[in-house]
A protein has these predicted regions:
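Helix C-cap/alpha-to-beta connector motif
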Residues: 3-15, 42, 97
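Charged helix-capping and loop-helix junction motifs
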Residues: 1-4, 31-34, 82-89
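Short, flexible, glycine/charge-rich loop motifs used to bind or transfer phosphoryl groups or to couple energy/partner
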Residues: 6-9, 34, 58-60
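EAL-family c-di-GMP phosphodiesterase catalytic domain
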Residues: 15, 19-27, 44-137
Length: 137
């Protein structure tokens, strides 16, 4: 992939982030860690998507040395229903581990304000932009 990006003169080093999804079990931890280090060494980064869902857990963070997590929209939506205790626990653990958090699926100003108050610095969701196809990005 890196060779292809270089061949196409597509300089995304430092800007291109890959996501480890909740449906992707890791069967070879050593190879996964080597690949993550390789990507990081070339300026590309891997983030855990939908953290605390499916296969994505604290075990991935410990074993792979990842630095970013995306909190799934299911947890963000709890803000609107006064059920955010699990979200608070996840954010607290991430902050203690010095992980960057991306709040995924932020749709309201109230969610944004509350998350910002809780120390979240990165956001994704309809409040900011609807999804775009590649040529529009």
């Amino acid at each position: 992939l890196i060779n292809l990006l270089k061949e196409l003169n597509f300089p995304l080093s430092g800007r291109l982030h890959f996501e480890l999804t909740e449906r992707m079990p890791i069967t070879n931890w050593e190879a996964a860690k080597r690949n993550i280090i390789f990507l990081n060494d070339h300026g590309y980064y891997l983030k855990i998507d939908d953290f605390c869902c499916g296969y994505n857990s604290f075990l991935n963070l410990i074993n792979l040395g990842l630095t970013h997590v995306k909190i799934d929209k299911k947890f963000i939506d709890t803000i609107d229903h006064d059920e955010e205790s699990i979200l608070f626990a996840i954010l607290s653990a991430c902050q203690t581990a010095k992980l960057e958090v991306i709040a995924e699926g932020v749709e309201s100003r109230e969610q944004y304000i509350k998350l910002k108050e809780l120390g979240v610095r990165f956001f994704q969701g309809y409040l900011f932009s609807k999804p775009h196809t590649f040529p529009l990005m």
